[in-house]
Amino acid sequence: METMPNWLMQRAFLTPDRTAIEIEEEKVTFVQLHEKVVSVCEHLTHVGVKRAQKVAVLMKNGMEMITVIHALSYIGAVAVLLNTRLSREELLWQMDDAEVVCLVTDQEFETENVPVCSFAEVMQGPKAEAFIQEEFSLEEAMTIIYTSGTTGKPKGVILTYGNHWASAVGSSLNLGLRDDDCWLACMPMFHVGGLSLLMKNIMYGMRILLVPKYDANFIHKALQTRGVTIISVVSKMLTDLLERLGEGTYPSSLRCMLLGGGPAPKPLLETCVEKGIPVYQTYGMTETSSQICTLTADYMLTKVGSAGKPLFQCQLRIEKDGVVVPPRAEGEIVVKGPNVTGGYFNREDATHEAIRNGWLHTGDLGYLDEEGFLYVLDRRSDLIISGGENIYPAQIEEVLLSHPAVVEAGVVGMADESWGQVPAAFVVKSGDVTEEEIIRFCEEKLAKYKVPKKACFLEELPRNASKKLLRRELRKLVEEM
């Protein structure tokens, strides 16, 4: 059984006085963070948290959540990270599914299903001597994070210490490390993209500027004034920042904007190229502990729209009906690597369906070019099949977003008696534009069968906490038409 020293303890020993976390005006060094975590361990031990138990965490981004996540790893308990935007029923379902022994939260939450530990009350209560893991076994589960459930019930993705370690190592081999690196963290830590930054923070000894709640104005200013070198974003966040940037650009010290969350519209990427903003388009998911494929800035100009090549320890191929297809042929993206989950909690059927011979079948569609660069087309479940033709919503959204009066766009399939399905578009507009003009604009740029048959205007598009588009909500709107 392969082990490593407890990551935060080791970091506090190696670089105790280096800044670990900045939140607003508060700065915490690695040794101070370790001391805070030990204190949380002792309080959690008093309320009965033990090694190997599963503990639900329902908290917002902040020092409290950081210390709880680390404290559970110190104790050897498994952190089940819950999305704060879910309904009460959804949260209860996930806690029941994960078989948690208690819930640690910074919010009002009452239930008889599971003991609820208010973080503030726990910290005001007594302490008990805690047995702290000085070593981590890389094979043991560290976290369970539920997939967003874009199709069917969410599944609890088990990520081991080894998965998180491999993810951080793979990222560093790809993006490089600098002594002055500071990663601005604005993604929720209950999602793997946000959580992965906590892992990088202690493994790299890198400063994190944590934004408790998404605030585009604060982030825009911080990129200019707080020495930020790296930031993780999705397309919506990047669009918000570019709006605020206007004709300007960001300091050269900002060396990487890691762009994930699904295929990015080309007009957005081209704007970044024009402004010299170093966007690294990336592809990953909960099951891969964050990114598994990234396009470095070297190829920003020549491979616009690509998610790049696999991280150093990872492999990727495209399959159709179980057969690896040649370059440019579309199929399912299949990946393998030490950062890839071994399976879903209590879901052997789903695990066997998704992971075959060590390869994870992602359910995403894409192709590789002749040089091995990945182009992500869409989720297989989002595919619109119209009269036997495959239509990728992301392609139509890209066209819609190139219209000067469109700021957001989402496309889903709509039932049609003749064709089975036809595209329907949902648009957030910034100026005067009609449904007819939108459809006419698409007719000039798309094959006839890809042109939306309806274009509906919304004040905003439904998105999850990571700002990813929720197509299932758009499908509900279509059904109500």
Swiss-Prot record:
PROSITE patterns: AMP_BINDING. Keywords: ATP-binding, Ligase, Menaquinone biosynthesis, Nucleotide-binding. Its EC number is 6.2.1.26. It catalyses: 2-succinylbenzoate + ATP + CoA = 2-succinylbenzoyl-CoA + AMP + diphosphate. Pathway: Quinol/quinone metabolism; 1,4-dihydroxy-2-naphthoate biosynthesis; 1,4-dihydroxy-2-naphthoate from chorismate: step 5/7; Quinol/quinone metabolism; menaquinone biosynthesis. The keyword ATP-binding applies. GO terms for biological process: menaquinone biosynthetic process. GO terms for molecular function: ATP binding; o-succinylbenzoate-CoA ligase activity. NCBIfam families: menE, PRK03640.1. Converts 2-succinylbenzoate (OSB) to 2-succinylbenzoyl-CoA (OSB-CoA). Belongs to the ATP-dependent AMP-binding enzyme family. MenE subfamily. This is 2-succinylbenzoate--CoA ligase. The lineage of its organism: Bacteria, Bacillati, Bacillota, Bacilli, Bacillales. The gene is menE.
